[in-house]
């Protein structure tokens, strides 16, 4: 409940000698709070009128009528702004290159026809390339498109900011098949941007084969190659391990699609019959 504050001045009819109040006067009565600061009153006559300090009254309320939560934005309505990608009126060209909702190229159509087709399909007409000649537009469910875009963006941010640690365990005498399975898993984890910890557990008398386990880990690191770089290792305790960190530069090159080969123009082949006919002429 908002508080009500009021300041009231009044004239008091005082009688008697000088009276000094050395401390503030406060009173609460049925939610009414009275506060009178320190003051002195001198009466010169039994019915002398003397101006008294003002009394500040406050009823109810919290902290001055303000919000209980200073930074609270609840209840604010977000202003919706029209996306430029939907502003078809901004296209000055009379024709556009239209793509349907299945990403099939329809071709050149008038701007009015593109709008009509989108309305008939109950879809949005979105501008993909406003600077192209003619501009490229596409029919789609724009809200769904934006949702998927934001979802992909969040997933990419998680991959760039978060790096999980994946563990791969194997024995010093692991067979080739199991070794290959762990190698493929390590490559996949590194390409996904995660660290890989390769562990070889030495139990009991297996500690005698420590050198074999160390050679196994070094071989594993060598076969990973530039895809992962060594972050840390431990070849002293019973649990031998090596931690590999993804090499982002190498992974980026691996994930890039290979460049398309340019088709060589077919050489004009002249048949022997044509050569013979030319010579006869």
UniProtKB/Swiss-Prot annotation:
Residues 63-86, 253-281 are annotated as: Disordered. Residues 1-51 form a transit peptide. This is Translation initiation factor IF3-4, chloroplastic. Keywords: Chloroplast, Initiation factor, Plastid, Protein biosynthesis, Transit peptide. Disruption phenotype: No visible phenotype under normal growth conditions. Residues 70-79, 253-270 have a biased composition (Basic and acidic residues). GO terms for molecular function: mRNA binding; translation initiation factor activity. The keyword Plastid applies. SUPFAM superfamilies: Translation initiation factor IF3, C-terminal domain (SSF55200), Translation initiation factor IF3, N-terminal domain (SSF54364). InterPro entries: T_IF-3_C_sf, T_IF-3_N_sf, Translation_initiation_fac3_CS, Translation_initiation_fac_3, Translation_initiation_fac_3_C, Translation_initiation_fac_3_N. Belongs to the IF-3 family. PROSITE patterns: IF3. Monomer. Chloroplast translation initiation factor that is essential for the coordination of leaf and chloroplast development. IF-3 binds to the 30S ribosomal subunit and shifts the equilibrium between 70S ribosomes and their 50S and 30S subunits in favor of the free subunits, thus enhancing the availability of 30S subunits on which protein synthesis initiation begins. The gene is IF3-4. Its main location: plastid. It is found in: Plastid, Chloroplast.
